[in-house]
Every structure is written in C-alpha cells, then in structure tokens.
C-alpha cells in the first residue's frame, strides 16, 4: 500500500497545512474505491524493488542514480524486470543503476525548452498538474525547488513515480497525489504552477486556467504548455471525433488566442516562450512503450498533418504571472 503519511507530516509544518482539512479524506476515499485491475501488480513491483541509496544522484542534467560499486548482473536484472512490470513508460528518460528506461517521450527535451524561460526555482514550492510519472518534478528539484507536488489521477503513473522515488533513496522532496485539479481547494500556496499537456484535454479550458490561478500565491508564476495551431488571436481548432487518434481533445487554440485566454482570466506579464513542432524523435515507440506512437498518428503521405487531416501536433509554452 502506498503511504501518503510522509506528505501529510511534511505539509503540517508549512504553508500547505490548510490542505489537511480536505486531503486525507480524499485520499482515504480514493483508497477505498475500486482500484485498477492491475494496481496490486503495480504496487507489488514497487514493494519488491530494492531500497538503494544512490552514491551519485544527478537531477540537474537528467534523472540519474548510480551506486558506489556497480550492481551485480542479478541486481540489475531484478530492477529491470520490476520496472518493466510498470510499462508503458511514457515520460522520462530515467537512468537508474544501469537500467536505462527509454520512455516514449523525451521529456528532457521539453524541460530544456522550458527551463531557460522560468523564474529561478530555487526554494520554490511547485505544483505540477497532470505530472505523469513525475519526471519533470525531479528536474524541478534538480533546479533548486524546495518541494514539488504533482497531481495525476492515473494509478500507473503513481506507481511509476513511487518506483523511481524508491530507487532515488526514498527522496521526499517530490510527492505525487492521485487527484485531478478539480479536486483541489483554492490553496493559493504555490510559487510556480506547471500545466503541461493538459489544457487540450479539458472540456472547459478557461475553467482550467482559473483552477490553476487558484493554486498560485500572489505574484506566482504559471507555466502552461499545450497544443496550438497557427493563426491569429481568434483562431481555435475544435477537432471532431479524434485528433491524432486521441478522443479527448477539445480545444486547440493559436498561441495568440491562448494569450488572450490567460489575459481574460486575470493573468499578467503573459509571454509566448516557445513554439515547437512535435517530432517523431521526441515522441516514439520504444522498448519501454511498445504500442502506437506519434508516427502512427500522422498522415503517412504528409507528416505535416494528422491521420484525420488536421495540422500535426505543435506545442507552445506560455509563461504568465498572477498579480
């Protein structure tokens, strides 16, 4: 059973303590509910991983843990087998004691695009909405953050995060909670809030922006990364049944339209930090994610379009401040 007690104890002593009025009951309710059919298998994989304290830990340039003496072939095989029980691995990569998890996404590339535009993360308390396996949270810690809290309701991602945490020496500087943004009270407690790869999955994108704003302290920074299309401030794509084979894509604005949405929600100092086409080098099938990936979602005769005929995925990073 994954234990959230350490997180409760941690926030009881800081400016997130008011979250304890609602959070333990929400987590207890989550634990009582019907779990995913494979949750026991996933949590067992975490439990059976060895407890290792890394001799060398690099979270600044990657997520890499190494031991002082190389692990035996049997130890490495044990770790690899247990981590493969947590497939598919979508966000990474991770290098853990000789086990290299080559994930579907090169999330390190996204981090390299985002990091130069951020306010200094040193000492900050951060919320990562839709954090997946938690890769970017570890990079936030590497960049100096005091505490990174991720929320994502996907149970496999929770187990992947806990597996990585265990192999990083049970590091308590990052925590993942199996919740959605709509389950959070207006905490107004985070110095930086990240929402990367979430907005286009929301039926009401402006409501999502308000929810993000409600988590920020005054003068806090929002980092928003999402799909965009080319166009002016009035351009928004509303896909039909699917976009790049995804059913749950609702609104894809232009970067300029997204800037207007942020302004409408009361954000200031809004800037478009980066716009990049997603390539099949950044998102692809690997040994750790063996099903379809981006190459299968693009028109085989015209990779500038999805199989449905829409513009191929392009992502923008916008930075804004809550006044």
From Swiss-Prot:
Catalytic activity, EC: 2.5.1.-
Residue positions annotated to bind carboxy-S-adenosyl-L-methionine are: 91, 105, 110, 130, 152-154, 181-182, 196, 200, 315
Extract the signal peptide range: none
The enzyme's first-digit EC class, named in words, is transferase
The UniProt catalytic activity note for this protein reads: carboxy-S-adenosyl-L-methionine + 5-hydroxyuridine(34) in tRNA = 5-carboxymethoxyuridine(34) in tRNA + S-adenosyl-L-homocysteine + H(+)
Instruction: Answer yes or no on keyword Lipoprotein.
Output: no
Q: Which CDD domains match?
A: AdoMet_MTases
Whether Membrane counts among this entry's keywords is: no
A GO biological process of this protein is: tRNA wobble uridine modification
Q: Which UniProt keywords apply?
A: Transferase, tRNA processing
Task: Give the domain of life.
Answer: Bacteria
Question: Which GO-annotated molecular functions does the record name?
Answer: methyltransferase activity; transferase activity, transferring alkyl or aryl (other than methyl) groups
Q: How does it assemble?
A: Homotetramer.
The entry's function note states: Catalyzes carboxymethyl transfer from carboxy-S-adenosyl-L-methionine (Cx-SAM) to 5-hydroxyuridine (ho5U) to form 5-carboxymethoxyuridine (cmo5U) at position 34 in tRNAs.
Describe the family membership recorded for this protein in Swiss-Prot or TrEMBL. Answer: Belongs to the class I-like SAM-binding methyltransferase superfamily. CmoB family.
**Name used for this protein in its record:** tRNA U34 carboxymethyltransferase
Give the source species.
Escherichia coli O9:H4 (strain HS)
Q: List the gene name.
A: cmoB
């Amino acid at each position: 059973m994954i234990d959230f007690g350490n997180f409760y104890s941690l926030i009881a002593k800081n400016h997130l303590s008011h979250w304890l009025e609602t959070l333990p009951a929400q987590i207890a309710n989550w634990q009582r509910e019907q779990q995913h059919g494979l949750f026991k298998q996933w949590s067992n994989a975490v439990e059976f991983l060895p407890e290792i304290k890394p001799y060398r830990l690099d979270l600044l340039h990657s997520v890499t843990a190494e031991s002082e003496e190389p692990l035996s072939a049997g130890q490495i095989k044990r770790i690899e087998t247990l981590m493969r029980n947590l497939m598919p691995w979508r966000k990474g990569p991770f290098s853990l004691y000789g086990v290299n998890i080559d994930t579907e996404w090169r999330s390190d590339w996204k981090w390299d695009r985002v990091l130069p535009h951020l306010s200094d993360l040193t000492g900050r308390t951060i919320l990562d909405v839709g954090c997946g396996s938690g890769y970017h949270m570890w990079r936030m810690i590497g960049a100096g953050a005091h505490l990174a809290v991720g929320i994502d309701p996907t149970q496999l991602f929770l187990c992947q995060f806990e597996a990585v945490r265990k192999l990083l020496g049970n590091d308590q500087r990052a925590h993942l909670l199996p919740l959605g943004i709509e389950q959070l009270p207006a905490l107004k407690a985070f110095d930086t809030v990240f929402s990367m790869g979430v907005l286009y999955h929301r039926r009401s994108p402006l409501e999502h922006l308000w929810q993000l704003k409600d988590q920020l302290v005054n003068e806090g920074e929002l980092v928003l990364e999402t799909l965009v299309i080319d166009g002016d401030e009035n351009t928004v794509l509303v896909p039909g049944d699917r976009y790049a084979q995804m059913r749950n894509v609702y609104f894809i604005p232009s970067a300029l339209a997204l800037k207007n949405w942020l302004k409408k929600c009361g954000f200031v100092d809004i800037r478009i930090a980066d716009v990049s086409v997603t390539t099949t080098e950044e998102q692809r099938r690997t040994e750790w994610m063996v099903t379809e990936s981006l190459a299968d979602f693009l028109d085989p005769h015209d990779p500038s379009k999805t199989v449905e005929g829409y513009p191929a995925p392009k992502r923008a990073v916008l930075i804004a401040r809550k006044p």
